[in-house]
Amino acid sequence: DPILGPEMKSTGEVMGVGDTFGEAYDKAQLGANSAIPSSGRVFISLRDCDKADGVIVAKSFTALGFELVATRGTAAVISQAGLKVDVVNKVAEGRPHIVDMIKNDGVTLVLNTTEGKQAIKDSASIRRSAENHSVYYTTTLSGGEAICLALEARKKQGQQVRRLQDLHLRVQR
C-alpha cells in the first residue's frame, strides 16, 4: 500500500540532479523506476482542506495537456474555477467508479489526498488498483505540484544526462 506515513515522507534511495527542482524530481522518479506520464487523464480526489489549492494543481495539469476527472465534490470546485472536468463515482457510490476507470486504462495519474481512518481505508482499493495497473499515484498536493514542475521542466529542456565529474567541476569553481 503506497500511502505515506510521517516517517516515509522524507526518505528515498535515488538522487536526481538538475538545474531546477522540477528537472531533479523528474530524474529522481525515473531513477526510482516510477516515470511520470507526460499525457493522459488525471484523477483528482481531494480532502476538503486541499480543494482550494488543488485548483491550482488542476490548472497546471490542464496547461500541460492532461484531461481531468474527479469525484463529485472535487469536480464541483474545479469546475467552478472554469476548468473542464468529468465526474466519476467514488467506489462506495457504485459503478462505474474510479477503480473501474483505472482497470480500463482510463487514467494515467492519480492525485488522491485523504484525511481520517475511514477515508484512508476507503481509498485503499484505489491505491491497490493504481499499483497493479502501473498508474502513477501521489497522496499529497505537494506531490501533485512536484509532478507538474517535473513535466514543465521536461517540456522545456528534455531529459539531459550529466556526468557527475562535470557537476563536481562546477562546484569547485
Predicted features along the sequence, with ranges:
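ATP-dependent carboxylate/acyl-activation modules
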Residues: D1-N104, L109-T139, G144-L149, K156-R173
